[in-house]
Each structure stands twice: as structure tokens, then as C-alpha cells.
């Protein structure tokens, strides 16, 4: 675009570390040792130093131009503001962003976006699906699509076991955290050569329920296909039940989806086919890259 920094009005970031700060801090006090708490707070300070980096490398002060937009608000904006619709129900879900894993909104053209429900970390459909993805031998960040595809080759015979791990909660769902190993209860993505990597999320109790995890070079067997099928169908049922509950309560005809979990095209197809919403709208990119555009669209 050949723009200079002084020609840019605002720099919008699809994270806001102050959002859910109270919830994050209280969670840390309950679950982390003091050293880890300090490390987390230091990371927050580092993330806020974007203006310092810009000043260092470009010799330009942008501190008054940087706007931090809550993560899921940016996600859902990347869907709603691309559409020519008057109103919709917004549903954003992923692993976690600003400590929220699900946020549900009322979306109306010309009005402020209104959040009506949210689910906080560590209850997360994204982390739940990711743990199974690792267990099935797909270790790379973003490998969940392989499990979604594998599901079509199996039968959902392990749904009863999955129901031991994820259950209906007061707002949406709750995870039995004893089946997970979150390493100090907060997941960190470390980066090596630009690629995120992380430890296994499933615990020994998880392995007692489903057996030995598949190695990355092990053959894919019937049990792996059936676990994938059971996982996929369980997620579809959980999400469909929730959006139908929301449809009945709020009477919206349109549904906007966003967040990393909405990359699950099989789930999206089931929503189109089985839900009572008239239309489903998606972001051009429901992941974090699209959320960056959503942050700018919202602001």
C-alpha cells in the first residue's frame, strides 16, 4: 500500500490482556505457584510493549494508535461486519483467547455488539479436541482437520466414554479436568522456527479410558478411526444442542460463526443441515489471522 506510519490512523490488535483480567488473576492465585504467576504477568507486560518495538525499529511513536480489541469480539466481528445482514446471533469458540473459550453475542447493525454468554478457560472445546488430536498421533499445531477427516472412516462407538470427559454445564459444557494434563494448568505455546509446539494435553487417566496413544509413525487402526468418529459426533451434538437452545431463547434467524473451532467444516455442514437457523455466515478466515481483520472492522 506504500503507506507511512504517520498515515496510519490506528493499529488494531485482536487481543486485550486487560479483558477477563480479574478472572485470570484469581485463577492464577488458585492454581499456579508464585514464580509462574510472575512469569505470566511478565508475559502480559511484554505483549503490551508493541509500541516500544515500533519505536525501536521504525523510530516512530505509535502508542496512542494501538487499540487492543478483546479476542472473541474481534473473531465475531470478522464474520458479522463482512455480511450484509441486519442482525444475527454470534458464536465464537476456540482453544482460548483472553481467557475466554466461547463467547456468544447479539449482533445488530448500527448497535454495539452485546455479549450474552461466555465460557472461560480451562473449559474449552478447542483444547478438548486438541487433546484427542494429540492422542491419535497428530502432534502438530493445526492437525485437528486430520481428525475431522479420519472421523468419516469410523463409527461413534466410544461416545459413552467421551461423555465422562465433557458434560453439560450451567452455561454450556464443562470438562472433567482429571483427564487432562495442562502443565501448571495454563497452556503455553512455545515457538521454534515459527512453529508452535506444546506438551501432550491428555493425562494418564485419559489413557486408562482410551488405551495407549498412537505414535506419529504408528499405523492408523480401527480404534483410532472410531475414537475420531466418536469425538466428532460428540462435538456436533454438543454445539447443535446449544445453538438450538439459543435460537429458541433469542429468536434470531441468522447465525454467525467464528473462532478456530469453526474451521470444522463437518460441524458447519451439520449446522446448515440440522439447525433451525435460516442462514449460517462464516468469516473469510475464522482463525486468529481473520481476527486481526476483525479487530480493525470492529474499531
What are these regions (language model features)?
Residues 1-299:
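Short acidic/glycine-rich loops and adjacent helix/strand connectors
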Amino acid at each position: 500500500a506504500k503507506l507511512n506510519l504517520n498515515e496510519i490512523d490506528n493499529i488494531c490488535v485482536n487481543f486485550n490482556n486487560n479483558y477477563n483480567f480479574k478472572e485470570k488473576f484469581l485463577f492464577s492465585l488458585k492454581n499456579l505457584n508464585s514464580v509462574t504467576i510472575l512469569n505470566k504477568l511478565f508475559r502480559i507486560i511484554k505483549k503490551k510493549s508493541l509500541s516500544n518495538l515500533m519505536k525501536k525499529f521504525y523510530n516512530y511513536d505509535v502508542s496512542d494508535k494501538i487499540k487492543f480489541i478483546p479476542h472473541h469480539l474481534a473473531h465475531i466481528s470478522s464474520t458479522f461486519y463482512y455480511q450484509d445482514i441486519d442482525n444475527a446471533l454470534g458464536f465464537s469458540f476456540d482453544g482460548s483467547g483472553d481467557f475466554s473459550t466461547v463467547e456468544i453475542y447479539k449482533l445488530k447493525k448500527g448497535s454495539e455488539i452485546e455479549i450474552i454468554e461466555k465460557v472461560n478457560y480451562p473449559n474449552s472445546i478447542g483444547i478438548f479436541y486438541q487433546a484427542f488430536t494429540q492422542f491419535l498421533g497428530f502432534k502438530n499445531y493445526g492437525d485437528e482437520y486430520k481428525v475431522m477427516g479420519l472421523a468419516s472412516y469410523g463409527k461413534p462407538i466410544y461416545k459413552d466414554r467421551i461423555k465422562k470427559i465433557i458434560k453439560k454445564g450451567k452455561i454450556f459444557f464443562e470438562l472433567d479436568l482429571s483427564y487432562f494434563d495442562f502443565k501448571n494448568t495454563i497452556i503455553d505455546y512455545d515457538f521454534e522456527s515459527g512453529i508452535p509446539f506444546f506438551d501432550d494435553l491428555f493425562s494418564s487417566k485419559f489413557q486408562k479410558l482410551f488405551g495407549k496413544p498412537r505414535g506419529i509413525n504408528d499405523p492408523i487402526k480401527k480404534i483410532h478411526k472410531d475414537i475420531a468418529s466418536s469425538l466428532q459426533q460428540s462435538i456436533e451434538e454438543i454445539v447443535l444442542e446449544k445453538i438450538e437452545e439459543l435460537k429458541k431463547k433469542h429468536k434470531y434467524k441468522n447465525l454467525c460463526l467464528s473462532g478456530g473451532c469453526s474451521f470444522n467444516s463437518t460441524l458447519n455442514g451439520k449446522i446448515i443441515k440440522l439447525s433451525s437457523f435460516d442462514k449460517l455466515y462464516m468469516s473469510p478466515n475464522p482463525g486468529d489471522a481473520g481476527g486481526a481483520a476483525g479487530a480493525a472492522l470492529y474499531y
